[in-house]
Structures are given as structure tokens and as C-alpha cells.
Amino acid sequence: MKIFLLTLTLFLTLNATSLTDDALKKMIGRMLVVGFPDATIDKESQIVKDMQKYNLGGVILFDKHFKDRNKTKNISSPQQLKQLTSDLNSFSPKALFISIDQEGGRVARLKPQYGFSKTPSALQVSHMSLKKSSNIYETQSEMLKDAGINMNFAPVVDLAINPKNRVIVGLERSYGSDISKVVAFSESMMKEQKLHNIISVLKHFPGHGSSLGDSHKGFVDVSQTWDSSELKPYKILIAKGEVDMIMTAHVFNSHIDKKYPATLSYSFNTELLRNQLNFKGLIISDDLQMGAISKHYTLAQRTSLAINAGVDILLFGNQLESVTVKKLVETIFKEVKLGNISIEKIRESNAKIENLHTKISIVQKPIIFTQKRQNLTKAYIKSHYELDVKDITIKPQTIVLHWTAVMDFQKSFERLNAELLFSDRADIAKASALNVSAHFLVDRDGTIYQLMPENWMARHVIGLNYSSIGVENVGGEANTKEDLTQAQLNANIRLVKYLKAKYPSIKNIIGHHEYREFEKSSLWLEKDSQYRTEKSDPGKKFMSDVRDALDK
């Protein structure tokens, strides 16, 4: 049996020469989030044609046109907006980021005059209790979710260092100058947005609260005002593993990069944010049509410098000026062909984008995991692996795919939910009373449910539990039929890619029926030589299809 090694090097090698021009343009399209002028759309709308031709990554919604504040752009009422976002999703061939600036206070696209709830500014919230802030952000998150928004360019984690700062401090967009307060209230918003499957985008890296200028209008130099303390909110939140996306600022700081503003700077985005702060998520630019950038760099320069600096998603709001998606794609495509942008960087950004879509699509449905079940798990580890452990955390190194042998989702869930083994599992009952479990359960329609933390041990495979993540699939009727669906296949592929990116320690992906191939490996810990069962799940064809897809 071939043990599948899911490594980035292999993936890139296999794909290095197989990319067509059309495929490349679609990958470029995935890296774009753009504004468009319509409050309603149909199949003839330009944004729909762009989504379908270029696999557009996302859109940003505004209530008004920047140059004509009396003219409605994308938002007029809750009902209208909900229909618009529904249509956007239905027309888009791939998962779409539908984004908005909804910080609260002065920066809020969903306003009471359109029928939405009012959200206080960050400064106002900072004078409240954390509990009150949670209630406020819960209400806002529900409003965003109901409207079909899945990405919010908030919270603002800029420190209010300069009282003369107009664009952040003057507009009450900062929670203040106290780092702990900024972190606490930012977490409050992020927590509520996460519960509603809304991506939080921290901004404006590396800090805009000390500036005197407005990057919307022109060049902003913070070389003499910026302080390293402005990095601390990012450092703290990144270390907690809570940050999926960060927006760059168009500020210039000669102490870090003597040539380029942060958005276009490798020193800021890769060396500082990626390498020093260890950020693994997505980097999105602030609007590349702002004066701080557009007045000094051509479109080709803006896009190529940003991508090479480490930016994954390019934002063009089409408020300050207008540019077509076709022109954006063709400009970047030309830069790639000229060798000014690496194809591998395009691939890497696309992989991160798809992984984030997978993450926000996962439904949380926890199984019962009381202290009793944890104690049973520790006893299992002691009995079968001869390890004394303080907790049940693991380092994932393998993903094992299964089927439940049950055709109904709820019955499959109930089989995994109980703490104690069911009476019909005589084949493994002597080994432990601990019930079987898995980290994920994939329904017939491809919906992924997370049942327990990925880094806790589940009982799902003999010998390898202590280093593996288990993925169960509803199906495999009576343990005889290879009947898992195409939707489940696609979901498993997406989930494997997401988990591998999250846990670089994962090197192997196997079917449950292949587990005995590991008996002589260092990962195998089972001490009972008689404790083995024969397995057929999730089917040889299913595993072959998964591997073929991962190889492409």
C-alpha cells in the first residue's frame, strides 16, 4: 500500500507544468475582492460575468457611491441586501467572500436609516463592560449573517497613539491606547463573528493610529510617529491562534522599509508579519485605489509589488476610481508571464483562500466529552499505549478516513455522541468501554461537522489514535457498499487540505482499511498484539479518488 505523503513540494512539482492560461487567470481572479455598482443583479450583470469567467474571489459592498453620496450603491434595505448576497452566491461558481466595512459608529455600511440596527463606535464600546460589548457584537454579527455577509473588515486594532490622528482616532475607530483593552474588545467582536461564521479582518497593519495623514488621499509617512507597541495587539492575537486575516495599511515607515509603504513591502508583510509574528493566515491589502498608493504606482506596479510582498488578496473598492476585473486579471497575468510575479505565489495564496472557505463552512456540533470521557480516554492511552498522560492532547500526524456504515446522519451522530461503547460492539468491547468517536463527520450532502477538538485523542483506529485525526462519512451501508457521494468526496478533499495546512506535522492520509500498514512504523503504539479488526471503509475507490484529486 502506498502511504500518501501530502507535501507541498510534491503538490507543486506535480502541478508546475500543467497550468493553462485560462486556469491561471481564474487563480488570479480568486485573489481579487472588488466593488461593483449594483443593488440588484441578474445573469447579464457585469459582476456576474466576471465571477463566472474569472472565479472572482469576492466583493466588497458599500451603501453609497463615494463621489455621489446621494446615490445608492449596493445597500438600501435588509431585504434588498439579503437578495443581493443570495444572488451573488448563486451565480458564483466558487465560494465567495462577501465583505463589508462594519466597524460601528462612523464606519458602518449597515445604517439605521436602511432598517439595520445601530452599532456604537469602537471608542464608545471601550467605555462599556466586555459583557455589554459581547451583546452588541452578537447583535451585529446576527445582522451581518442574516444579510449574507461572511467577511467584516473589523475589528480595528490600531492604537489611539496620536490624538491629532483624524482617520482613526478622530473617527472613534480605535478602542484606545491601552493594549490590553484593544485586545479584549477586539476579541469580543472576533468571538461573536466567529460564532456566526463571519471572517474577522484585523486592520490596519502595522498600525495607523500614530499617523497624521489619511492614506485615502495621499502619501502617509509614520517614520517619526510609529511605535513598536502598535504591533502588540497583532502579536497577542496571532499567538492565540485567533486571526484568519489581516489588512495592510498604506503607511510608509523608513525604519522598516526605506522604499515601499507597508502594503507593497516584503519587509513588512513577509519578514515582519509572517516570519517574526508567525502569522499563517491571509493578508489582504487595503484598497489599492487609495491615493497613498495609486498616485505613486501604476496598476502593474501596485499589483506585482503587493503580491511579491506577501499579500494574498488584492482589494479594489472601485469607489475612488474605477477599474474592470478584466483589466486587473490581464494586468496581473501579464506580470506573471513577464516573470515579475511567481506562479508559486499565486498557488500559495489560492490554497490559503480555499482553506479559509473550508474553515468557515465547518459546522460545530460537539459530541459529549465530559471529564468522564476524558478520564476513559487517558485510561485507554495507559492501557493500550503504556503512556501516562496529564491530558488527551495529541500532535496530529495522520488523517484517517472512515465510513459510519449507517445511512442516516442523526443515527451516525448518536453512535459517536455517547460516552460509553454500544452493546453491539463486541468486537472491540474487551479493549475498553470508551465509545468510538471522530473529530469530523461528513454528511451525504458534503456538509462537514466538527465533533471535537482536532488535537484531542479520539478512539477511531487501532494503534494510531494518539497521532491521528478521524473523519467519519455517513454511508457505507452495512459495511459492504462503497456508496459515499461525490459531495462527500469533495468535502473530504477540502478538509484534508485545510487540516494539512493547519497542522504541518500531518504527513499521511489513509483509509481505515489501511491502518495495519502502519504496524511497523513509529506511529504505531498498540501494545496488545491480539487487538486487531478487519476494515473495509471508506472503500478503495474512494481513497483512490481522494489521492488522485490531491495529486492534481
Could you say what each language-model-derived stretch is?
Residues 42-46, 59, 71-91, 96, ...:
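Second-shell residues forming the walls of enzyme active-site clefts
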